[in-house]
Amino acid sequence: VRTGARDESIELSGVSHFLEHMCFKGTPTRSAEDVNRELDEMGSQSNAFTSQEQTVYFCSVLPEHQLSALNLLSDIMRPTLRQSDFDTEKQVILEEIAKYDDQPPYGGHDAALVKHFKSHPLGNSVLGTAESVSALTQPQMLEYFHRQYSANNLTLAVAGKIDFVKIVEQLEAECGDWNNHDVQRDTQRYSTTPDTANITNIHKNGTHQQYIIQITDGPSATDADRSAGQLMATIFGDDNNSRLFWDLIDTGKAEYAVLESQEYQGSGIFLGYLCCPPESQESLLQRYCQLTTKLHENGVTQQELDTAQAKVCSHIVLRS
């Protein structure tokens, strides 16, 4: 479903992720127990996740179960959203938020996105906040569902040993009467002016490590240089066999040091993440800056580029 945290208002922060949970709580023809039982009977590997821009429901089954799995996934796209289920699941979401805030980097990722994007919707938290989720009502979720879960806003992807003709026939029979309208999304590019004072400190008692997150503008999902950005991030900051890995991780100076390229519709970022002992923070940040300066001035070697291309291509194939 082409909907996520960036499609939410401040008042509805967290509703996309909350709705993802609710889609497994029953439909007009299935109870929550039926949904889980049928997934288990098919021997499926299934799950769901919500991001800034999409909510994904997926299911891997043997070929003989493909139509049954399609029927089930289509059905949960039309949940009942009962008040009783809403009230129960709200407590689950609040516990998830508390757990997220109590583990590394202790809300630092969301805080960094808010600091970078400011009022832009890409700074919205996927989970929402305890305050926004607590205040959310079932009618608000119902209105959001009818607005965002339009047939025109859903994409079905099927791969493997499939019967394409039967899948299309079943979709037309089961989903042909779904409400269909255009869903709007503001994809205006966001760019920020570098600000050395743009820093937020979060203090957490009892921690033994320092978690540092840095964000700067990067290519969007449709920019011509998005692949170059991804390859550069892989060379410089992949979690294995990158410049940061050999300089900071393999030497034992830092516990974790990566650079990621994250592309969205209309905007993008490079996100750097460093985890180290507090007493090493200043020296490691200086070294991090030295490495980025070297990358900027000297570029990359052909061997680094070849390795990164092989790694990225392998990830694309294996991920699918």
Residue ranges of each PLM-predicted region?
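Short, compositionally biased low-complexity segments
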Residues: 11, 66, 201-208
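Charge-rich, well-structured scaffold segments of protease-associated domains
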Residues: 32-185, 190-193, 201, 219-220, ...
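Short beta-strand-initiation
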Residues: 196-197, 243
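Acidic, glycine-rich loop-and-beta core segments that form the ion-binding/anion-interacting portion
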Residues: 170, 192-195, 207-216
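Active/ligand-binding-proximal structured segments within catalytic/core domains
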Residues: 1-39, 112, 214, 224-236, ...
